[in-house]
A protein has these predicted regions:
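Short acidic-hydrophobic sequence patches enriched in Asp/Glu that either
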Residues: 37, 194, 198, 256
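Histidine kinase transmitter module recognition
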Residues: 109, 172-175, 191, 205, ...
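Hydrophobic alpha-helix immediately C-terminal to the catalytic Tyr-X-X-X-Lys motif of short-chain
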Residues: 164, 168, 172, 202, ...
């Protein structure tokens, strides 16, 4: 494998993967295909060697462009997605266009040219798990964990389109022999993350003198994983994974939102209770 395409490679998680590949695998040339929406940024790719990397600005739903690029590559790693839950409730169409139609264009091209395909997805396709205190036996903290056998139960236009794209890939593997793998990862944090996301939003608010807001009681639990660990896992799946398999990526880093906000405040030299409780979002 000498050439790979990384869709969404100018976004948060995708750009971290591009840096990971360039830094750790000197024989690989990376082509980034990115629409450069508000979540994508050329600066995320600054400093990369020009002979190892190319940025193509375009839409993954552009079948002609995708066909041209895929015909010249050895593998596609598909990160590109509309991923903001709140935005999906306001206008679902971009999520259908990118997450469903875009995925279709990519897997069709990979099928046509017999190109290896890895599909990066999210644990949000599984919906919400109950906290331990809501399960028989009581107690506090994390309850069940997702497994590869957990049924899909998406709860928003975003997560439903990601679930739909996962199922498209599974169908193309079974129906057409697509050489594909899927990974569903938990919440990422790390460099280049957009300020709309939970951790950078709290940090930015504190730096700006704005009191961080905690929705509800802050009991929502997320498993947090650093993007470097996620990138390493995706590369391992791409190069060693079994075709047709789905891999769950996590870090056993479960923390509730309240704990995360308090930790950020303490690390930034503030009173850990210097946040504001607001009504939970519907």
């Amino acid at each position: 494998m000498k050439n790979i395409i990384v869709t969404g490679g100018a976004g948060f998680i995708g750009s971290n993967f591009v840096h990971y590949v360039i830094n750790n695998h000197p024989d690989i040339h990376v082509t980034v295909l990115d629409k450069l929406t508000y979540a994508g940024n050329r600066e995320n790719l600054s400093g990369l060697p020009e002979d190892r990397f190319e940025l193509v600005v375009g839409d993954i739903a552009d079948a002609e462009l995708v066909d041209k690029l895929v015909s010249k590559t050895d593998a596609v790693v598909h990160y590109a997605a509309e991923s903001h839950n709140d935005n999906s409730l306001k206008d679902p169409y971009p999520f259908l266009h990118t997450n469903i139609i875009g995925t279709y264009a990519l897997i069709e091209a990979c099928r046509k040219y017999d190109v290896r395909y890895h599909h990066v997805s999210t644990d949000e396709v599984y919906g919400d798990l109950p906290l331990r205190e809501d399960l028989p036996g009581k107690g506090e903290g994390v309850g069940e964990k997702f497994t590869a056998e957990t049924p899909y139960n998406p709860s928003s236009p975003y997560s439903s389109t990601k679930a739909g794209s996962d199922l498209l890939v599974k169908a193309w593997v079974r129906s057409f022999g697509l050489k594909a793998t899927i990974s569903n990862c938990s919440n990422n944090y790390g460099p280049y993350q957009h300020i709309e996301k939970f951790i950078p939003r709290q940090i930015t608010n504190i730096l700006s003198g704005i009191t961080p807001k905690l929705y509800g009681e802050g009991k929502n639990v997320r498993d947090w994983i650093h993007t470097e660990d996620h990138s390493s896992a995706v590369w391992t799946i791409l190069t060693k994974g079994r075709i047709g398999e789905t891999y769950l990526i996590g870090a056993d880093g479960e923390e509730d939102n309240k704990t995360v906000i308090e930790l950020i405040l303490e690390l930034m030299g503030k009173d850990k209770n210097a946040y504001e409780h607001v009504n939970d979002r519907a």
